Amino acid sequence: MQNLAPRINKTHTAIGPRPQHSVARAIAGSMLLSATLIVAATAEEYPNRPVRFVVAFAPGGITDIIARLVGERLSERLGQTIVIDNKGGAAGALGAKLVSTSEPDGYTFLVTTTAIAVNAAASPISIDPRTQLVPVAMAASSPTIIAARTPATSKSLPEFVRNLKQDVLTYASSGAGTVEHLTAAYLLKGISGIAATHVPYRSGAEAINAVIGNHVNLSSTPVGSAISVVQNHQLQILGVASHKRVAMLPDVPTFGESGLADMD
C-alpha cells in the first residue's frame, strides 16, 4: 500500500465504541492473543468513521473469534465502530484479494492466518502480501491439532489409522492450502497403509462440525477452534503440531512423541 494509512473493511456485525493513538500500537496491544495476522495500512487523521475488518474465513472459526475480540477492544480505544466482514473462500485468498484492492485510506484491515504465505505461492487468485499489504501485528500462536469424533479409543494418530479398518481416510480443514491442510497431508503421508482424502471447508468451525457429524474421519484445525468441543467431550485430539505439549491439554501427545514428524 503506497501511503502509510490504517485499514479496515464489512460482516455485517458492528462493534461500537479513545483518541488519536497510533493504530499500530492500538492493534498490537489488543492482539497478543492469537495465531492470526492483522494486515493493514496506517493513517494520520484516524478514525472519523467506522473501520472495517475483513475476516478471510467464515464465521465461527478461531480467526473470526479473534477478529471480534480485537474489534471490541479496538473500538473502545479508538471510540469508533468496528465492522466485521467475513469473506471466506479459497483458503483466505478471497479476503486478501478484496483488501488489496480497497482504498489505502486506513479504514480496511485484513484478518487472516499464515495461509496468506501459502496462497502467495499456490493460489491462482493470490496477491503478494509483501508489496500489496502492510503488516500491523501478529496476535498469537495456536498450534494445529488433528482430532477425531468421540468416542475414539485411539490415543494417537498412528493408532487411529491402524484401528480404522478401511483403506481410505477423509480429513477436513478450513480450506485447501491452509496450514492445517498441509500439516495433515504431510503427517498422514508418513503413515503407511492408508490413502487420505482432503475435504476443504470455509472455516475451522465447519471442519470441526464435519467430524462431529461423522462426515469425515478427522479434522485438522487450530487448537483454539477445538477446545470448547473437546471440553464438551465431542472431539478427541490425537496429536498436536508442536515441539512440546499444550499446557491446557497435557495428556495430548505431540506428533513427534507419536513417532511422526516433529513440527512447530
Predicted regions and their residues:
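Extracytoplasmic "Venus flytrap"
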Residues: 53-66, 90, 172-179
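Bacterial N-terminal signal peptides
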Residues: 26-37
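Hinge/capping helix and adjacent helix->loop/strand transition within the periplasmic-binding protein
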Residues: 101-107, 120-206, 255-260
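Short helix-initiation/N-cap motifs at beta->coil->alpha
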Residues: 87-95, 141-142, 198-209, 222-225
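Alpha-to-beta junction loops
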Residues: 80, 102-110, 167-169, 212-220, ...
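C-terminal lobe and pocket-closing loops
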Residues: 141, 226-264
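Short, well-ordered beta-strand elements
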Residues: 49-58, 82-83, 108-111, 134, ...
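Beta->alpha turn/N-cap motifs
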Residues: 111-116, 204, 221-226, 241-243
